[in-house]
């Protein structure tokens, strides 16, 4: 019984220290640090590594074959209204799948991507590669009706552009929030 109480106390202590750090709290050691009256007021920013494409080779559950997947998360969050308020990053994915073939996919964590136009399944957005001119980006809705993801209608065209770009900017029409922009920046272009 005593061991269980000790273990519970350790778990609570660890959980509390993570909660304090993640929610702006300070630990006792940090709050009791001496302050300097002669501080310049400047704080050096931490060095952040540039984003990179993340490459994985998952296995398809049906065929048992592995496939290629590359993903990068947006450097900015969408500014959506209730009920989608809060941090909401996008993901740009390239997938070569044994069942579905080549796909270039744009997805958001929450919200509803709208597809303006006459064709319910076809979406036309604007996309910009590096400092080039904005171009029309034709996409298709997900077959399952998901509103958080769209697939490039011309994935080979998009793949060719991604192989050369370090900055990709996509403008999406979001339900009750208008046009929203996601920016994807990478240290190196897609290696595909």
PLM feature spans:
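Alpha-helical transmembrane anchor segments and their immediate juxtamembrane flanks
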Residues: 1-26
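A generic "folded-domain core" signal
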Residues: 19-192
